[in-house]
Amino acid sequence: MEEKRRRARVQGAWAAPVKSQAIAQPATTAKSHLHQKPGQTWKNKEHHLSDREFVFKEPQQVVRRAPEPRVIDREGVYEISLSPTGVSRVCLYPGFVDVKEADWILEQLCQDVPWKQRTGIREDITYQQPRLTAWYGELPYTYSRITMEPNPHWHPVLRTLKNRIEENTGHTFNSLLCNLYRNEKDSVDWHSDDEPSLGRCPIIASLSFGATRTFEMRKKPPPEENGDYTYVERVKIPLDHGTLLIMEGATQADWQHRVPKEYHSREPRVNLTFRTVYPDPRGAPW
Protein backbone atom coordinates (compact mmCIF):
# COMPACT_ATOMS: atom_id res chain seq x y z
CA MET A 1 0.00 0.00 0.00
CA GLU A 2 2.81 2.29 0.92
CA GLU A 3 4.51 1.44 -2.38
CA LYS A 4 1.44 2.53 -4.40
CA ARG A 5 1.40 5.89 -2.65
CA ARG A 6 5.06 6.44 -3.41
CA ARG A 7 4.55 5.67 -7.10
CA ALA A 8 1.61 8.05 -7.29
CA ARG A 9 3.74 10.86 -5.86
CA VAL A 10 6.51 10.21 -8.42
CA GLN A 11 4.06 10.18 -11.37
CA GLY A 12 2.44 13.37 -10.14
CA ALA A 13 5.77 15.16 -10.14
CA TRP A 14 6.02 14.72 -13.94
CA ALA A 15 2.54 15.98 -14.63
CA ALA A 16 2.07 19.56 -15.96
CA PRO A 17 0.84 22.02 -13.39
CA VAL A 18 -2.84 22.78 -13.61
CA LYS A 19 -3.44 26.19 -15.14
CA SER A 20 -5.30 28.45 -12.87
CA GLN A 21 -8.40 30.06 -14.46
CA ALA A 22 -7.69 33.62 -15.46
CA ILE A 23 -9.75 36.13 -13.66
CA ALA A 24 -10.86 38.91 -15.98
CA GLN A 25 -9.66 42.24 -14.75
CA PRO A 26 -11.78 45.28 -15.61
CA ALA A 27 -10.04 47.55 -18.13
CA THR A 28 -9.26 51.03 -17.01
CA THR A 29 -11.36 53.30 -19.21
CA ALA A 30 -12.51 56.84 -19.25
CA LYS A 31 -15.84 57.53 -17.73
CA SER A 32 -18.74 56.79 -19.99
CA HIS A 33 -20.14 59.75 -21.90
CA LEU A 34 -23.47 58.83 -20.39
CA HIS A 35 -22.16 59.93 -17.00
CA GLN A 36 -20.78 63.27 -18.27
CA LYS A 37 -22.60 66.53 -18.13
CA PRO A 38 -23.90 68.07 -21.41
CA GLY A 39 -21.09 69.85 -23.28
CA GLN A 40 -18.37 68.15 -21.30
CA THR A 41 -17.39 65.91 -24.23
CA TRP A 42 -16.88 68.92 -26.56
CA LYS A 43 -14.85 70.72 -23.89
CA ASN A 44 -12.51 67.76 -23.70
CA LYS A 45 -12.06 67.80 -27.50
CA GLU A 46 -11.58 71.54 -27.49
CA HIS A 47 -8.91 71.17 -24.85
CA HIS A 48 -6.99 68.70 -27.02
CA LEU A 49 -7.32 70.90 -30.13
CA SER A 50 -6.06 73.96 -28.31
CA ASP A 51 -2.92 72.09 -27.40
CA ARG A 52 -1.98 71.80 -31.08
CA GLU A 53 0.14 74.60 -32.53
CA PHE A 54 -0.94 76.01 -35.94
CA VAL A 55 2.00 76.67 -38.25
CA PHE A 56 1.44 78.79 -41.41
CA LYS A 57 3.47 77.75 -44.43
CA GLU A 58 4.15 80.08 -47.33
CA PRO A 59 3.02 78.72 -50.73
CA GLN A 60 5.91 77.20 -52.61
CA GLN A 61 4.86 78.59 -56.01
CA VAL A 62 2.95 81.73 -57.00
CA VAL A 63 -0.02 80.97 -59.24
CA ARG A 64 -0.06 83.24 -62.31
CA ARG A 65 -3.11 83.75 -64.45
CA ALA A 66 -3.23 85.19 -67.94
CA PRO A 67 -5.26 88.42 -68.02
CA GLU A 68 -8.60 88.44 -69.81
CA PRO A 69 -8.42 90.02 -73.29
CA ARG A 70 -9.70 93.57 -73.55
CA VAL A 71 -12.45 93.95 -76.15
CA ILE A 72 -12.66 97.21 -78.11
CA ASP A 73 -15.81 97.45 -80.22
CA ARG A 74 -16.97 101.07 -79.92
CA GLU A 75 -15.83 104.22 -81.65
CA GLY A 76 -13.07 106.04 -79.81
CA VAL A 77 -9.38 106.62 -79.18
CA TYR A 78 -7.78 104.06 -76.86
CA GLU A 79 -4.36 104.17 -75.20
CA ILE A 80 -3.61 100.49 -74.72
CA SER A 81 -0.19 100.79 -73.07
CA LEU A 82 2.52 103.16 -71.90
CA SER A 83 6.20 102.21 -71.87
CA PRO A 84 9.62 103.85 -72.25
CA THR A 85 9.07 103.45 -76.00
CA GLY A 86 6.00 105.67 -75.80
CA VAL A 87 2.20 105.49 -75.83
CA SER A 88 0.56 102.73 -77.88
CA ARG A 89 -2.74 103.99 -79.27
CA VAL A 90 -5.54 102.62 -81.47
CA CYS A 91 -8.44 104.61 -82.94
CA LEU A 92 -11.62 102.81 -84.01
CA TYR A 93 -14.19 104.28 -86.41
CA PRO A 94 -17.03 101.85 -87.20
CA GLY A 95 -19.10 102.86 -90.23
CA PHE A 96 -16.35 105.04 -91.69
CA VAL A 97 -17.79 103.94 -95.05
CA ASP A 98 -21.58 103.45 -95.08
CA VAL A 99 -22.97 100.02 -95.89
CA LYS A 100 -24.30 100.72 -99.38
CA GLU A 101 -21.05 102.28 -100.58
CA ALA A 102 -19.00 99.60 -98.81
CA ASP A 103 -20.90 96.87 -100.68
CA TRP A 104 -20.05 98.50 -104.02
CA ILE A 105 -16.38 99.03 -103.06
CA LEU A 106 -16.00 95.39 -102.00
CA GLU A 107 -17.31 94.19 -105.33
CA GLN A 108 -15.01 96.52 -107.28
CA LEU A 109 -11.90 95.56 -105.33
CA CYS A 110 -12.50 91.81 -105.56
CA GLN A 111 -12.79 92.13 -109.35
CA ASP A 112 -10.18 94.75 -110.25
CA VAL A 113 -7.23 94.44 -107.85
CA PRO A 114 -4.42 92.17 -109.21
CA TRP A 115 -4.55 89.70 -106.33
CA LYS A 116 -1.75 87.18 -105.98
CA GLN A 117 -0.82 84.43 -103.54
CA ARG A 118 2.82 84.86 -102.59
CA THR A 119 5.42 82.56 -101.09
CA GLY A 120 6.85 83.55 -97.72
CA ILE A 121 9.91 82.34 -95.84
CA ARG A 122 9.95 81.78 -92.10
CA GLU A 123 12.81 80.08 -90.27
CA ASP A 124 14.23 79.08 -93.67
CA ILE A 125 11.00 77.25 -94.56
CA THR A 126 8.97 78.42 -97.56
CA TYR A 127 5.18 78.48 -97.36
CA GLN A 128 2.22 79.78 -99.32
CA GLN A 129 0.65 82.78 -97.62
CA PRO A 130 -2.90 81.87 -96.52
CA ARG A 131 -4.40 84.95 -98.25
CA LEU A 132 -4.02 87.00 -101.42
CA THR A 133 -2.17 90.32 -101.51
CA ALA A 134 -1.49 93.32 -103.74
CA TRP A 135 0.76 96.37 -103.43
CA TYR A 136 0.37 100.00 -104.48
CA GLY A 137 3.10 102.60 -104.13
CA GLU A 138 6.05 104.30 -105.80
CA LEU A 139 8.52 102.27 -103.74
CA PRO A 140 9.06 98.54 -103.14
CA TYR A 141 8.19 97.02 -99.79
CA THR A 142 9.83 94.01 -98.13
CA TYR A 143 8.39 92.00 -95.23
CA SER A 144 8.78 88.35 -94.17
CA ARG A 145 11.50 88.15 -96.83
CA ILE A 146 8.90 88.96 -99.51
CA THR A 147 9.55 91.97 -101.73
CA MET A 148 6.57 93.74 -103.29
CA GLU A 149 7.62 95.53 -106.46
CA PRO A 150 6.65 99.19 -107.00
CA ASN A 151 3.18 99.73 -108.47
CA PRO A 152 2.36 103.40 -109.06
CA HIS A 153 -0.91 102.62 -110.88
CA TRP A 154 -3.43 103.22 -108.14
CA HIS A 155 -6.97 102.01 -108.70
CA PRO A 156 -9.29 105.07 -108.65
CA VAL A 157 -11.33 103.64 -105.76
CA LEU A 158 -8.19 103.11 -103.68
CA ARG A 159 -6.91 106.61 -104.33
CA THR A 160 -10.29 108.05 -103.33
CA LEU A 161 -10.25 106.07 -100.07
CA LYS A 162 -6.68 107.18 -99.31
CA ASN A 163 -7.65 110.83 -99.77
CA ARG A 164 -10.72 110.43 -97.56
CA ILE A 165 -8.70 108.87 -94.74
CA GLU A 166 -6.06 111.60 -94.96
CA GLU A 167 -8.71 114.34 -94.83
CA ASN A 168 -10.41 112.83 -91.77
CA THR A 169 -7.34 111.84 -89.75
CA GLY A 170 -4.71 114.41 -90.70
CA HIS A 171 -2.22 111.64 -91.53
CA THR A 172 -0.64 111.15 -94.95
CA PHE A 173 0.28 107.90 -96.69
CA ASN A 174 2.16 106.96 -99.85
CA SER A 175 1.69 103.18 -99.98
CA LEU A 176 -0.97 100.50 -99.59
CA LEU A 177 -0.82 96.77 -98.82
CA CYS A 178 -4.08 95.03 -99.77
CA ASN A 179 -5.16 91.70 -98.26
CA LEU A 180 -7.94 89.41 -99.47
CA TYR A 181 -9.17 86.79 -97.00
CA ARG A 182 -11.13 84.44 -99.26
CA ASN A 183 -12.82 82.47 -96.47
CA GLU A 184 -12.50 81.44 -92.82
CA LYS A 185 -9.31 79.47 -93.57
CA ASP A 186 -7.33 82.52 -94.68
CA SER A 187 -5.37 84.37 -92.00
CA VAL A 188 -2.26 86.34 -91.09
CA ASP A 189 -0.01 85.22 -88.24
CA TRP A 190 1.42 87.25 -85.35
CA HIS A 191 3.66 90.09 -86.54
CA SER A 192 4.44 93.79 -86.19
CA ASP A 193 4.64 96.35 -88.97
CA ASP A 194 8.07 97.45 -87.82
CA GLU A 195 10.20 97.17 -90.95
CA PRO A 196 13.02 99.78 -91.06
CA SER A 197 11.56 101.33 -94.21
CA LEU A 198 8.48 102.40 -92.20
CA GLY A 199 10.52 104.49 -89.77
CA ARG A 200 10.03 104.82 -86.02
CA CYS A 201 6.47 104.64 -84.63
CA PRO A 202 4.75 104.19 -88.02
CA ILE A 203 1.07 105.02 -88.44
CA ILE A 204 -1.02 102.28 -90.06
CA ALA A 205 -4.57 102.91 -91.30
CA SER A 206 -6.58 99.70 -91.75
CA LEU A 207 -9.89 99.81 -93.64
CA SER A 208 -12.06 96.66 -93.80
CA PHE A 209 -14.75 95.51 -96.22
CA GLY A 210 -16.77 92.31 -96.20
CA ALA A 211 -17.05 89.66 -93.50
CA THR A 212 -16.34 90.63 -89.90
CA ARG A 213 -13.06 89.21 -88.65
CA THR A 214 -11.44 89.53 -85.23
CA PHE A 215 -8.27 91.62 -85.11
CA GLU A 216 -6.18 90.36 -82.18
CA MET A 217 -3.30 92.15 -80.47
CA ARG A 218 -0.81 91.01 -77.83
CA LYS A 219 1.83 93.01 -75.99
CA LYS A 220 5.43 92.00 -76.44
CA PRO A 221 6.77 90.42 -73.22
CA PRO A 222 9.52 92.04 -71.13
CA PRO A 223 13.06 90.59 -71.40
CA GLU A 224 12.74 88.56 -68.21
CA GLU A 225 9.94 86.47 -69.77
CA ASN A 226 12.35 85.15 -72.43
CA GLY A 227 9.84 85.48 -75.26
CA ASP A 228 6.96 83.85 -73.36
CA TYR A 229 3.62 85.44 -74.35
CA THR A 230 1.51 83.43 -71.86
CA TYR A 231 0.81 86.26 -69.42
CA VAL A 232 0.90 89.33 -71.66
CA GLU A 233 -1.93 91.81 -72.19
CA ARG A 234 -4.25 91.12 -75.12
CA VAL A 235 -6.80 93.10 -77.10
CA LYS A 236 -9.56 91.91 -79.44
CA ILE A 237 -11.19 94.22 -81.99
CA PRO A 238 -13.99 93.00 -84.29
CA LEU A 239 -13.55 94.74 -87.65
CA ASP A 240 -16.88 95.12 -89.41
CA HIS A 241 -17.81 96.09 -92.97
CA GLY A 242 -16.64 99.69 -93.57
CA THR A 243 -14.67 100.02 -90.28
CA LEU A 244 -11.47 102.08 -90.04
CA LEU A 245 -8.77 101.24 -87.48
CA ILE A 246 -5.71 103.45 -86.89
CA MET A 247 -2.62 102.14 -85.09
CA GLU A 248 -0.17 104.82 -83.99
CA GLY A 249 2.48 105.72 -81.44
CA ALA A 250 4.53 102.81 -80.09
CA THR A 251 1.98 100.19 -81.15
CA GLN A 252 4.28 98.47 -83.67
CA ALA A 253 7.25 98.58 -81.28
CA ASP A 254 5.40 97.19 -78.26
CA TRP A 255 2.60 95.04 -79.74
CA GLN A 256 1.98 92.30 -82.27
CA HIS A 257 -1.26 91.69 -84.19
CA ARG A 258 -2.92 88.98 -86.28
CA VAL A 259 -6.14 87.86 -87.96
CA PRO A 260 -6.64 84.20 -86.96
CA LYS A 261 -8.48 81.47 -88.82
CA GLU A 262 -12.16 81.04 -87.96
CA TYR A 263 -14.04 77.87 -87.05
CA HIS A 264 -17.23 78.96 -88.78
CA SER A 265 -17.83 79.79 -92.42
CA ARG A 266 -16.86 83.32 -93.47
CA GLU A 267 -17.48 85.29 -96.64
CA PRO A 268 -14.57 87.14 -98.34
CA ARG A 269 -12.98 90.11 -96.60
CA VAL A 270 -10.77 92.83 -98.10
CA ASN A 271 -8.43 94.73 -95.79
CA LEU A 272 -6.58 97.85 -96.96
CA THR A 273 -3.56 98.89 -94.86
CA PHE A 274 -2.26 102.37 -95.74
CA ARG A 275 1.26 103.31 -94.63
CA THR A 276 4.25 105.52 -95.42
CA VAL A 277 7.39 103.93 -96.87
CA TYR A 278 10.71 105.81 -96.96
CA PRO A 279 13.17 105.33 -99.85
CA ASP A 280 16.17 104.96 -97.57
CA PRO A 281 15.73 103.53 -94.05
CA ARG A 282 18.62 105.73 -92.93
CA GLY A 283 16.55 108.76 -93.85
CA ALA A 284 13.40 107.52 -92.12
CA PRO A 285 12.33 109.37 -88.95
CA TRP A 286 13.73 107.40 -86.02
UniProtKB/Swiss-Prot annotation:
Domain Fe2OG dioxygenase: 172-278
Keywords (A to Z) from UniProt: Cytoplasm, Dioxygenase, DNA damage, DNA repair, Hydroxylation, Iron, Metal-binding, Nucleus, Oxidation, Oxidoreductase, Ubl conjugation, Vitamin C
Substitution effect: residue 177 to A/N: Loss of activity against N1-methyladenine
GO biological process: cell population proliferation; DNA alkylation repair; DNA repair; negative regulation of cytoplasmic translation
Key word Manganese present: no
Cofactor note: Binds 1 Fe(2+) ion per subunit.
Record's compositionally biased regions (Polar residues): 22-31
Annotated consequence of substituting residue 131 to A: Loss of activity
Ranges for region Disordered: 21-45
Activity regulation remarks: Activated by ascorbate.
GO cellular component, one term: nucleoplasm
Catalytic activity: an N(1)-methyladenosine in mRNA + 2-oxoglutarate + O2 = an adenosine in mRNA + formaldehyde + succinate + CO2; a methylated nucleobase within DNA + 2-oxoglutarate + O2 = a nucleobase within DNA + formaldehyde + succinate + CO2; an N(1)-methyl-2'-deoxyadenosine in single-stranded DNA + 2-oxoglutarate + O2 = a 2'-deoxyadenosine in single-stranded DNA + formaldehyde + succinate + CO2 + H(+); an N(3)-methyl-2'-deoxycytidine in single-stranded DNA + 2-oxoglutarate + O2 = a 2'-deoxycytidine in single-stranded DNA + formaldehyde + succinate + CO2 + H(+)
Domain of life: Eukaryota
PTM (free text): Ubiquitinated; undergoes 'Lys-48'-linked polyubiquitination. OTUD4 promotes USP7 and USP9X-dependent deubiquitination of 'Lys-48'-polyubiquitinated ALKBH3 promoting the repair of alkylated DNA lesions.
Recorded consequence of changing residue 191 to A: Loss of activity
Residue positions binding 2-oxoglutarate: 179-181, 269-275
Residue(s) carrying (4R)-5-hydroxyleucine: 177
Molecular-function annotations in GO: broad specificity oxidative DNA demethylase activity; ferrous iron binding; L-ascorbic acid binding; mRNA N1-methyladenosine dioxygenase activity; oxidative RNA demethylase activity
Gene3D superfamilies recorded: Alpha-ketoglutarate-dependent dioxygenase AlkB-like
Subunit structure, interactors included: Interacts with the ASCC complex composed of ASCC1, ASCC2 and ASCC3. Interacts directly with ASCC3, and is thereby recruited to the ASCC complex. Interacts with OTUD4; the interaction is direct. Interacts with USP7 and USP9X.
PANTHER family for the chain: ALPHA-KETOGLUTARATE-DEPENDENT DIOXYGENASE ALKB HOMOLOG 3
Family the entry assigns: Belongs to the alkB family.
Name of protein: Alpha-ketoglutarate-dependent dioxygenase alkB homolog 3
Organism: Homo sapiens (Human)
